[in-house]
């Protein structure tokens, strides 16, 4: 959940997919003002929260999903006007697009103050924190003697798991495991280090099952039993267990400084429904609503008043909330230079091209 690079995403394919989505769902800005269109990750809002909002206001909420931050960010860069009233985006993109005056100022929302200052600062003035978490490894407990504790386990893959590993296609997360293996920061701009990481990923490629986001992969592939573990985001294992109706999936944050993601919500300035959109975000930040949402999604809430309402087992779940010491050591997603992004884009393009060319 991080920065974007636009060289390795097929823009034409994305636009075809996006237009199909619009046709199928008849999304347009001529739609009723009693509808809000929200662009977000899969499985990241509780149905009961959407129902409670509709019951209270009469305003419907239409949900549209993206698979990775780069896909969403490229679409935003290339499109003059998007048919979404509200967008979920990483903290880096929130600042980038806020500088372009495409989002509404949200500092006046009353319930914004319910969030911890750390996460408010991460999202800035034109977005509000929605959830946060860490990048780690989702894995099937029945197939492992012990949880994965090293990032090398998804790069230098043990024979039993070869061809069964999922990666992420993202300008930071794709390279992250290899960079940690090299004792480097996942956001390093060292050309030599990035090239070393490329060589590690290239060697791992024959043993990678997919570069598709794990939640999207299991929904779109019938042979989901092939997947043993995947680079993923905290909370994803709960979605996997819900999807498979099992308790086999778990989540591990390997050793080293945790890499933290922050999801923010923003209101599109060209939306005709900015009043309702802001009201919806304020509704989501009510402590009781934020608590319901966090418990359903099984993600870390930035809302300290909501956390006080959550069950003890949620607050003490170390797969959701990092221990304080590890949180203090965490690296929060930050903006990469154009040169860094360009090199990463070339690396990822080469890695995924070689992956797709596998026999």
Curated annotation (Swiss-Prot):
Location, primary (coarse class): periplasm
InterPro entries linked: SBP, Sperm_putr-bd
Subcellular location: Periplasm
Coiled-coil annotated spans: none
Record key words, sorted: Periplasm, Signal, Transport
GO biological process terms on file: polyamine transport
Signal peptide: 1-33
Disruption phenotype: Deletion mutants form biofilms thinner than wild- type and show greatly reduced surface accumulation compared to wild-type.
GO molecular function annotation: polyamine binding
GO CC, alphabetical: periplasmic space
UniProt-listed PANTHER family: NORSPERMIDINE SENSOR, SPERMIDINE/PUTRESCINE-BINDING PERIPLASMIC PROTEIN
Family recorded in the similarity comment: Belongs to the bacterial solute-binding protein PotD/PotF family.
Function: Acts as a sensor of norspermidine and enhances biofilm formation. When complexed to norspermidine, could interact with the periplasmic portion of MbaA to regulate its enzymatic activity.
Protein name according to UniProt: Norspermidine sensor
Organism in which the protein naturally occurs: Vibrio cholerae serotype O1 (strain ATCC 39315 / El Tor Inaba N16961)
